Amino acid sequence: MAAGGFLTRAFDTMLKESGGKKFPDLQKAIQAYQDGSKVVTQAAPSSIVESSQAEGGGEKTGVEADEPQKVTSAEVAQQASQSKSETINVSLANAGHTLGGAEVELVLKPLRLAFETKNLKIFDAALDCLHKLIAYDHLEGDPGLDGGKNSAPFTDILNMVCSCVDNSSPDSTVLQVLKVLLTAVASGKFKVHGEPLLGVIRVCYNIALNSKSPINQATSKAMLTQMISIVFRRMETDIVSASSTVSQEEHVSGDTSSPKNEEITAADENEKEMTLGDALTQAKDTTLASVEELHTLVGGADIKGLEAALDKAVHLEDGKKIKRGIELESMSIGQRDALLVFRTLCKMGMKEDSDEVTTKTRILSLELLQGMLEGVSHSFTKNFHFIDSVKAYLSYALLRASVSQSSVIFQYASGIFSVLLLRFRDSLKGEIGIFFPIIVLRSLDNSECPNDQKMGVLRMLEKVCKDPQMLVDVYVNYDCDLEAPNLFERMVTTLSKIAQGSQSADPNPAMASQTASVKGSSLQCLVNVLKSLVDWEKIRREAENSTRNANEDSASTGEPIETKSREDVPSNFEKAKAHKSTMEAAISEFNRNSVKGVEYLIANKLVERNPASVAQFLRSTSSLSKVMIGDYLGQHEEFPLAVMHAYVDSMKFSEMKFHSAIREFLKGFRLPGEAQKIDRIMEKFAERYCADNPGLFKNADTAYVLAYAVIMLNTDAHNPMVWPKMSKSDFTRMNATNDPEDCAPTELLEEIYDSIVQEEIKLKDDDTMKKLSSQRPGGEERGGLVSILNLGLPKRISAADAKSETEDIVRKTQEIFRKHGVKRGVFHTVEQVDIIRPMVEAVGWPLLAAFSVTMEVGDNKPRILLCMEGFKAGIHIAYVLGMDTMRYAFLTSLVRFTFLHAPKEMRSKNVEALRILLGLCDSEPDTLQDTWNAVLECVSRLEFIISTPGIAATVMHGSNQISRDGVVQSLKELAGRPAEQVFVNSVKLPSESVVEFFTALCGVSAEELKQSPARVFSLQKLVEISYYNIARIRMVWARIWSVLAEHFVSAGSHHDEKIAMYAIDSLRQLGMKYLERAELTNFTFQNDILKPFVIIMRNTQSQTIRSLIVDCIVQMIKSKVGSIKSGWRSVFMIFTAAADDEVESIVEKSFENVEQVILEHFDQVIGDCFMDCVNCLIRFANNKASDRISLKAIALLRICEDRLAEGLIPGGVLKPVDGNEDETFDVTEHYWFPMLAGLSDLTSDYRPEVRNCALEVLFDLLNERGNKFSTPFWESIFHRILFPIFDHVSHAGKESLISSGDVKFRETSIHSLQLLCNLFNTFYKEVCFMLPPLLSLLLDCAKKSDQTVVSISLGALVHLIEVGGHQFSEGDWDMLLKSIRDASYTTQPLELLNALSFDNPKKNLVLAGDIEADASDSPRVDRNPDDIKDNGKVSAQASPRIGTHGTSLESGIPPKADGSEGRPSSSGRAQKDVDDVNLQRSQTFGQRFMDNLFLRNLTSQPKSSVAEVTVPSSPYKHEDPTEPDSREEESPALGAIRGKCITQLLLLGAINSIQQKYWSNLKTPQKIAIMDILFSFIEFASSYNSYSNLRTRMNHIPTERPPLNLLRQELEGTTIYLDVLQKTTSGLADDASNSEDRLEGAAEEKLVSFCEQVLKETSDLQSTLGETTNMDVHRVLELRSPVIVKVLEGMCFMNNTIFRKHMREFYPLLTRLVCCEQMEIRGALANLFKAQLKPLLQQ
């Protein structure tokens, strides 16, 4: 570019336009520039520049000299001009080269003159030239800056540019001017400041507002925006340097900013205390009180009052000295420019005129202000000092805009407020707390607010609610702050109310549309709130997780501590919020009832229980009702009275005039209405005033009277109802007293009177505030600021009142701003995710209400979709925060809105609800948890509607067909993949949730199965999802299956066989699938899987189902036999249940498979399931359907035993039950036991074949494997296997086996006992310890009344002795003999003695025991065996107790052939025989009948092979009672007695067997014991058979019949006894051992004594016979002759030595028998003489 080319061209254009004599000054100035530029010098550019710079200062005003002066000094001027031109040319040659001072003047003078010409072309050329000079940085200076470089010329040229534009200027000129101005402001060297800057902005304003060209308007607006942005960017670049300057000045001068910083720092340090609101109970500083005072004033007055207050505050800041922020002197240039621009914008936005120009100006100002606030950098938002300097202007402008009637202005107010919320909330905390209710809540709460204004606010909220951090900050700093309103909660609650607004039928379509838009926008705001919370939670949780992971990886110890301290922040705010809520509740309670309110405060520890704390609370809490404060202070109780005293004492009245003091006193409360209360309060006031002002009044009474008079005067003067008014003299007289010294001075009284009459005593709050307080409902936020919400509906009485209130608030607000301003306060920023929970708790329910009501009453699709988004977000956030109640409420509401339960009422919105619900199942299935039941019920209902044409046809009943078809089609689509995904996604659920899912689906399926007809949709899905989830870990699957199994059991037991079959088949499929998974040892999952089959098999009544179950199990065995492990247990349990089936085909099919498993897959059944296999076989052996199966089952049991014996069952699988077992204990014995027990049970089967087979297998198994059994196992076998076989024998009663005719069972029992005894003998060494219980068994049976049982048991005993006696040890023999002895005593028929009631005269043979029961008692006798003495007699202490068994069995022993007697009478009634004096006790007919019966039975010859005792036939022959009814007449008691008699005979046979076979094996004590036992038998029988007893009985029976007797027992016992004694005494030798000598001596003594006794009794009878001819004696002798004969025969074989030794005793007795009439006796006597006496005679 040529040097100065653009400038030369511009000047040429100007010269051309100013040709001739026009504008001569301009021509001269241009000519001067051109003349100087023609001379070109070759000097170095640097020298020229230096020369010009040096000369520039002196030639600055040379161009301004007169023309003649120039002519006279032409040479000098020419030289200077040449030098300057050369310098200008060099500077203009390159951009960025600036001109010097003189050069600037040389260039600018033509431009200034050009602007004065008013010629457009010259204008344009000059503007273009100036634009290039500034743009190329040729001009450098600071226009508008005092003392700045080139300030004056640049200011002038800018002013001229600004002034050359007016309304008539062409557009091109206007655009050129705008270009120059923008370039000037934007230039880095041409820096515009101060007034020039404002002038530039003013020109742009005028163009934007007044230009008729839209292009110019738009351009000017754009340039204004750029200029403002440039100004604030410059300010931001100066922040660092300005901050350092301010810091230095603060350090030196100590201005007001330093205390400000200190205050903020202190607040930061005490953040926790302030947050928790503890300062409420402490004395507040002046600033805090003033801020709250401001809030109260704002809350109680209208917007006009607030405007006035802020206006006065703004005017205060127009001076140089600003009380807060930054002083102008300390500001940087950029900050001052920004401050000027900012204030200018605010002031232009504050204008009050309502004309069009003013409105446009305000709109533009607010628009620019908003754009500026939006465009500044983030660092500017933190420049607290600068913001403090401008926030009063900003607040005022915003306040004026927020109350403007213009909707456009209000929209900009909303926009500006949104910027403050989003960007400046931390620096304008107090202002936001004030304007949020004014702009947002007031507009939304006011029903009369225009819809367009509401829409503006809602659009603003839509924007700001998308900022999650903003919402969190608002909640933390306001809702959790005790001193602030609940902005977040109130905002959401208000939006919720708007969204729920009633749908009124507005006749105006436009209004209806606007109302709908308002609702939709409010709903959008609510959704944005929820979405923001969701987003913030997600972001912060991810950040916290990252931080936590970083901390875990870090080795630093400081970081975790810091993290922990940060994590405490949310809990602190949560506590603060709870504290605030409690405080609000307390204040609300106080405003209802002051006494209860104070108690509430104390109970919740909000204030201490002392009067000073309560008084401080009453004074400092502005939201308390002044009326209720007065009411509380007037109470007469002790504590309120103390509070009133403390309240008054806390006030200071020093140096205050009386009327001022009483005004100050009554500001805080309203006096109560009762005179006594007023009296107490004013009395205390007078006392306090006098104390603070001593000497003013003589005493307090004077002050009290005056105070009372002032109250009366105030009421009189300002109450319009009072007339006439009190005069000054009246007031003076009212205070007069008799003592002039006690009266107040007249001057004081007159002063008070004038003051009160002129100005009423009022409360601190004005009348409006009082009305609002009285009308405010309980529960509103603390502080008067809340009443801003009601500013749209002012409640005033008159215009005068309004004016008074406004003036009051203006005055007080002005004072506050002048002294303190609004305290910024501590702004908290929380980043911990836990803060979200209390936020959701605060607004969750209003959100749910808004969504629910909208869904319920509306059909607007956009709003419905918003509701769906809200439901989705609400469910998500409630889930992630663990808020189960809220999550459940959201979910259940969403489920309810599907309307699947009422298809007729369904609409498209319900389809959307269903769509969202299914979408949640797909995207966030974890959130459903305890609502799965409702969700799955919806899916079930959906399938039912779609699959049922009749139901589908009713959908959306009443709508047009197109809509209905659309809804049905949508339902079909949802029933497809979306519904299917609900089940497919079950695999994504965590363990807990998937269990809930299965549980819910089972519940839904159960309900489906209850329907008619039953449905299986959910059952099918159960099977499907079971397949999906079968791969889960076993622990989870086990929990799932515990739920499934119960349901499958229920379904498998359904009354509809088709459903039951489907359930069972599904079970089979699942079982097959699960069996594919390998199972390790000791796990039981397979068993759990198959267990439902077992339960159904056991419980179902359907043959088809049972058959199907068996088929399923058979199929599973055949296909998965190698995979079955623990499942065998359930398999065998199923077959076990099948074994009891009544259908033979099921039994056979089951058994065939069991047989196949055992024969082919026995190795699979080993281990834990072996016992189940055995139990199954045992159950089959017990089946009733087929004997063949039973026998084969027993055979399979034997096979199992063989496999077990072969070692196929690994040892160690089952541990011994008793850990203290011997080391040699064989674990496999636990496998033996179930088999043995089963076989033992089978031995009592009713089928002989089965019974015998089981018996043979059992004992065969024991004999074959018994040598490997341990001692404990043998003991278990005897007690639990073998002995129970004979339970039916040992418990046999009257209904015996013989009576049933089952002879085979008797044979089995005999055989069993024999096998038992053989087994005992076979393994005697192993089981010898079992002899006592074995003997106990046998002899217990021997004590029974059933003759068959007795015969079987004693026969087995004899067999045991005969076969195994040779192995018995000495102890065994002792045990055996002791048992026999006990049995002999127990089975003695003692009832016989009692029944006949006789006395035995022979003391040495009588039974000493008392008889305590009659013949009807039980045969059981509990006798202690130790009562039997060595001599065989029963001690006197043994008194057996007799009881009766009602079910005793009849004897099985047939009557002897030679026994005969007639049939007795059947009468059973007792009759006394008074004629028979020989009887001690009268005999009943029944007893005589019993005697006859026993005579018949006991004298008969038995044919039983068990007892081979022969008794000589009696000479008396009786008819054999073969009548079939003779046994039927026998009573149970008689049967028991007869059984005992037979038992005695059998026991004698057992003893006989012992002495015959094992006598030589016995020791001396055992032999003596046998003698004693035999003697006891003989003793009892002989006592019953004694002469006196027989004779007594003979008198009661017919003479042709023998009397009752025990001759057979006596004879048998005598025979064996004599045999034993003779065997013992037959071998007397001199060389015998001591023990043998003792035995033989005892035997000799017993033998001699016994023989002598029998002979003596017989000889005595013979003597009696000789003396008399009594037939009774003959009959007695005849009956007893067999015994006598046996004794005589025994004596024939007596040892000769013994006989000779006792010849002297025997001989007299024997000689008496020579004359005996019984031939048998005489024959026996002859043989005795021949055997014993003949040898003696020969000697």
UniProtKB/Swiss-Prot annotation:
Subcellular location: Cytoplasm, Cytosol; Golgi apparatus, trans-Golgi network membrane; Early endosome membrane
Function, in words: Activates the ARF proteins by exchanging bound GDP for free GTP. Plays a role in vesicular protein sorting. Acts as the major regulator of early endosomal vesicle trafficking, particularly at the trans-Golgi-network/early endosome (TGN/EE), but is also involved in the endocytosis process. Together with VPS45/BEN2 required for polar PIN-FORMED (PIN) proteins localization, for their dynamic repolarization, and consequently for auxin activity gradient formation and auxin-related developmental processes (e.g. embryonic patterning, organogenesis and vasculature venation patterning).
Region (Disordered): 44-82, 243-262, 543-571, 1415-1477, 1504-1532
GO MF annotation: an example: guanyl-nucleotide exchange factor activity
SMART domains: Sec7 (SM00222)
Protein name: Brefeldin A-inhibited guanine nucleotide-exchange protein 5
Keywords: Acetylation, Auxin signaling pathway, Cytoplasm, Endocytosis, Endosome, Golgi apparatus, Guanine-nucleotide releasing factor, Host-virus interaction, Immunity, Innate immunity, Membrane, Protein transport, Transport, Ubl conjugation
Main location: cytoplasm
PTM annotation, UniProt: Ubiquitinated.
Induction / repression: By the pathogen elicitor flagellin 22 and by benzothiadiazole (BTH), a synthetic activator of the salicylic acid (SA)-dependent immunity (at protein level).
Post-translational modification N-acetylalanine, affected residues: 2
Phenotype of the disrupted gene, per the record: Inhibited trafficking at the trans-Golgi-network/early endosome (TGN/EE) leading to an increased accumulation of PIN2 in agglomerated intracellular compartments leading to an altered auxin gradient and subsequent growth defects (e.g. disrupted roots architecture and shoot growth). Increased susceptibility to Pseudomonas syringae infection. Displays growth and polarity defects.
Domain of life of the organism encoding this protein: Eukaryota
Assigned GO CC terms: cytosol; early endosome; early endosome membrane; trans-Golgi network
Stored InterPro entries: ARM-like, ARM-type_fold, DCB_dom, Mon2/Sec7/BIG1-like_HDS, Mon2/Sec7/BIG1-like_HUS, Sec7/BIG1-like_C, Sec7_C_sf, Sec7_dom
One GO biological process term: regulation of auxin polar transport
Membrane topology: Peripheral membrane protein
Ranges where the SEC7 domain occurs: 572-759
Active site: 674
Organism field: Arabidopsis thaliana
Pfam families reported in the protein's UniProt record: BIG2_C, DCB, Sec7, Sec7-like_HDS, Sec7-like_HUS
Assembly with partners or alone: Homodimer. Interacts with hopM1. Interacts with HLB1.
Biased composition (Polar residues): 44-54, 70-82, 546-557
PROSITE patterns according to UniProt: SEC7 (PS50190)
Notes on activation and inhibition: Inhibited by brefeldin A.
Ranges of biased composition (kind: Basic and acidic residues): 57-69, 1417-1432, 1516-1525
